[in-house]
Amino acid sequence: MADAKVETHEFTAEISQLMSLIINTVYSNKEIFLRELISNASDALDKIRYQALSDPSQLESEPELFIRIIPQKDQKVLEIRDSGIGMTKADLVNNLGTIAKSGTKSFMEALSAGADVSMIGQFGVGFYSLFLVADHVQVISKHNDDEQYVWESNAGGKFTVTLDETNERLGRGTMLRLFLKEDQLEYLEEKRIKEVVKKHSEFVAYPIQLVVTKEVEKEVPETEEEDKAAEEDDKKPKLEEVKDEEDEKKEKKTKTVKEEVTETEELNKTKPLWTRNPSDITQDEYNAFYKSISNDWEDPLAVKHFSVEGQLEFRAILFVPKRAPFDAFESKKKKNNIKLYVRRVFITDDAEELIPEWLSFIKGVVDSEDLPLNLSREMLQQNKILKVIRKNIVKKMIETFNEISEDQEQFNQFYTAFSKNIKLGIHEDAQNRQSLAKLLRFYSTKSSEEMTSLSDYVTRMPEHQKNIYYITGESIKAVEKSPFLDALKAKNFEVLFMVDPIDEYAMTQLKEFEDKKLVDITKDFELEESDEEKAAREKEIKEYEPLTKALKDILGDQVEKVVVSYKLVDAPAAIRTGQFGWSANMERIMKAQALRDTTMSSYMSSKKTFEISPSSPIIKELKKKVETDGAEDKTVKDLTTLLFDTALLTSGFTLDEPSNFAHRINRLIALGLNIDDDSEETAVEPEATTTASTDEPAGESAMEEVD
């Protein structure tokens, strides 16, 4: 090369600064340099393949399309060669040094702002990532339209370009020779190279070959003289057919020696599964592929392999696991388990925009033909293509869930693991809300052994039933004895049991299903009734008006109103909330939130309605007591407060002052045991309460009224 003319050029200030920044970085994940260089090689191969479509002669200079990695341990040099389009002298000068790419400055600004070095590909300057591991580089390149040239730099302010008269003829393509830093020699090791290629470039469309040196055993003659004699003997014509057993015995003696041989090993032999026809792929192949990308030891529950063609092209294989991850809804958990490839080049497995959070349990691969390769391979920013891919993924996964639902056993397994995700989807995804609602399953008053779907519920509705009714609570045991169920059971209306905390969030968004309104029976609502029932109710309202007024006066601000209820049967009273506030169950959930906003709690905890049942003996007797003794009577007040606290508990609320409630119950217990001494009463509850005085035996009269 000494005789060839050496041209020296200066880097633009920005590129010089960029190389200096990269070469001195303390960034630990330096392996991404290999991903970037393989990606560039793949791009170059794409270009020559595209040219060859219209002009096949372009491939004559090097018919084989490949990427080859050659570790030269003795020289501490890593070579990466491709048979792509190559670069002319002008390309080498302009593209690698004198014309600043638009992304150069942007990348440096991003780095200064704390961005990850691995984002380098996003800015179109991935080539310079080689300076993460090397401080000197040669780029040998041959384009079909030019001679072979060498571009060389040590990351200073200058680079040279020389006509190459000494290196191996490439035919066509580019070879990078990276002179590795002393602390980066691991990238000459076969194991490390294979590890990085498997992680980042396993599904590149072109063969990635690694030149490896292996030690093999070989049989050789015992002496040199015998070796030469054997060679001479080989040149003589042989009549093997007349060779007898005696001749075989006279064969020369050999010995076994070890010697090093160089072989080329293909690292990405397994062609991308998603590029194959689904009908040609066995379930075992899908299972093996799933395990390789998910680290799961179980087979997947279901797989969806599809391609989208037209204005947008992409292929995907998506898997539904059998189990939910243990950290499914932790805030710091990775929100996406789908590997994104662009034309078989791995981009990222952390593109949160690729899939909604409620589908974060889905694992798989998406390979796009349309996304640009120079997007970040770690942090893809949102763009229109990604939105379309996301929309298609959601659609296909809902299809898959519906297919799973056709097998009851499979669906039970799926629903146990991922029902929360479906409900989160209903809460967040307005477009697919109704489709997801078809997947919901609940126990109910008519289906206590097996969960029922909303669709099946609708088919069982009596003709005069207009709404879908549900009750929320902490557990099945808690809700199935609720006083709110009585009136609906009497009308033969089915009520769904919703006992998962996320159910209520989902229902606030779902609102209706198949044109039927979803109604929480713990809140205020209109129950279907006949004309006769309406007339009877209006009569009862007038009859019990003095009692409702008296109870409201006693309870004060604890309730918004007291009403005569036609929705209670056996229970004497219940507490209902307004339509737009929190239910008792939601209030319980929100109180359990450690970081809750207390201002929101006071706003959303709607005023309570105290409902009384005119058919209850207790309410009938209380009405008489009020009419006889008036609302100011101590016994009336005491019984009203006890009745209210009991209704709070049976309606799913918690008591603000449980000690007061316990005091009243203890007084009734004492009375039942004929303990009516003042000193004993004081021992049970030493501190007087605002609603019960210790200087008169109110408990006795209270007990009489209860009886």
From Swiss-Prot:
Keyword Cytoplasm attached: yes
One Pfam family recorded for the sequence: HATPase_c_3
**Protein known as:** Heat shock protein 90 homolog
Binding of ATP occurs at 40, 82, 101, 127, 377
Renumbered to this chain, motif TPR repeat-binding spans: 703-707
How is the subunit organization of this protein annotated in UniProt?
Homodimer.
Q: Which CDD domains match?
A: HATPase_Hsp90-like (cd16927)
From the UniProt entry, list the residue stretches annotated as the region Disordered.
216-257, 676-707
Which intervals carry biased composition (Acidic residues)?
222-232
An annotated GO BP: filamentous growth of a population of unicellular organisms
Query: Domains: what does the record tell us?
Result: The TPR repeat-binding motif mediates interaction with TPR repeat-containing proteins.
Key word Cytoplasm present:
yes
Q: Which PROSITE patterns match?
A: HSP90 (PS00298)
Listed A to Z, the keywords are:
ATP-binding, Chaperone, Cytoplasm, Nucleotide-binding
